[in-house]
């Protein structure tokens, strides 16, 4: 029986040949930071998965009934979405903002503009500008299509792993497990985690510009990460083992971006400063 063509298997094997090549199909440039990226997943599929995941989150979690939390998150979200639209970003997003009644210090934005804020992060935000810091970071992940880029990255790693495994099976079958262990460790610490930290830093950079253009004081960005660091106790893992840069590094990087961000804030159509304080 002839072997049937499998699109996913074909992509998985062929991607390693395209490592580092952004002249190929599926390459684009990120907004604001202008970084070249490779994307093999259509944006429509990303959005479809994002909507499905968001609906599941809302079904499985208790939605906050705190009127002030819902009002602040919704208001900040609409202002950030409008600032993004003025730059022709997220124009195909159906924005939605939900507060989850959970004390976890977390927030996220799924493809398609589906934003969730957990109640636990709001006291650290302290005010509307603090909410804007977190939310502009999260929506930047979606605007830059970091989710699609991570899916492409997984295909790259899987494809290269298959090639290495095939070579090991042919050349040194008794050492196959050793080769694969070294490969998996190398890709984790040399490729996957550094790339994840790059995404986080890029979302910070995009976010401070978006919040400034939305009329929120960008000086609050480094202050938020200093507060966030202070809210955590206990020993943290070394940065090279983490998916995120350290809070201190993020605050320092954002301070370097302040001069341009302040100019954008001063040129914003409306200025809200730090906005309403969150009790």
Regions found by a protein language model. Name each.
Residues 2-279:
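A Zn2+-metalloprotease active-site environment signal
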